[in-house]
């Protein structure tokens, strides 16, 4: 489980992409491929910046789509990269990351990659409930992470097998626009450009969970874009900036199981 790529998702916001890529340059990374996926827009400024960007930690690949996919199709197309990688760390261009994000992502992926209960790994920790705008503070445990039945779009890891299970479900469900899925009333109202509502619905319908850190390794700058009409600051979460040792306390699922420290290989 060492074949993990960092994938940045861009459209027409060169300043946002620059901010994200500069945060990646400050991260604790030994060697990792970087893929910059750019949807078709009315400017080639983003493509020029991406092509000129120097990535010192390994291979860099720029994907430029010849037609406009739109946010939903663009994000879902990233899953195709899992034909070539064991996992991908997906970062939209309005995200920035903490220095330890990659070490955490790799360790969590190694630990949870064979757990069928897990649909993905979040780098972000919610400071509030974004449906009610009320404060949210997950009940602390002796571990570094917790489980929540909410998919993540503000910095997340997709693993090959869990993503394929989701995408097979998505292909069978997308045509009815979630009409047959109960208990997701607040997400059904999201527009058809949203891919996230399908991943959330999948977690609820199939009883899957995302792994969340108690301290964020990513934050959302919420720049003006497809789902944000003006720049926002409410989605920013404090980043875990202190140096993290390369050992994490991950609980097996469910929480009552014994603690297990991440090893070199995925569980068999």
Language model features by range: what are they?
Residues 1-91, 95-264, 268:
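Peripheral/terminal regions associated with large enzymatic or DNA-binding modules
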């Amino acid at each position: 489980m060492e074949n993990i790529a960092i994938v940045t998702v861009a459209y027409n916001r060169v300043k946002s992409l620059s901010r994200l890529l500069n945060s990646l340059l400050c991260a604790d990374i030994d060697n990792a491929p970087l893929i910059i996926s750019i949807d078709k827009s009315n400017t080639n400024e983003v493509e020029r910046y991406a092509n000129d960007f120097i990535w010192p930690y390994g291979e860099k690949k720029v994907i430029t789509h010849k037609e406009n996919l739109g946010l939903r199709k663009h994000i879902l197309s990233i899953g195709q990269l899992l034909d070539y990688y064991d996992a991908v760390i997906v970062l939209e261009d309005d995200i920035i990351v903490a220095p330890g994000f990659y070490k955490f992502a790799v360790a969590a992926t190694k630990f949870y990659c064979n757990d069928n209960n897990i649909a993905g790994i979040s780098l972000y920790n919610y400071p509030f409930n974004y449906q009610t705008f009320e404060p949210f503070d997950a009940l602390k445990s002796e571990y570094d992470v917790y489980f929540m039945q909410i998919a993540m779009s503000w910095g997340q890891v997709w693993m090959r097998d869990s993503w394929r299970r989701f995408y097979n479900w998505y292909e069978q469900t997308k045509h009815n626009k979630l009409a047959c899925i109960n208990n997701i009333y607040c997400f059904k109202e999201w527009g058809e450009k949203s891919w996230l509502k399908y991943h959330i619905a999948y977690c609820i319908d199939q009883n899957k969970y995302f792994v969340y850190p108690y301290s964020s390794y990513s934050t959302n700058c919420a720049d003006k874009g497809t789902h944000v009409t003006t720049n926002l600051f409410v989605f920013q979460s404090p980043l875990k900036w202190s140096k993290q040792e390369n050992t994490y306390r991950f609980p097996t699922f469910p929480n009552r199981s014994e603690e297990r420290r991440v090893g070199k290989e995925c569980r068999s």
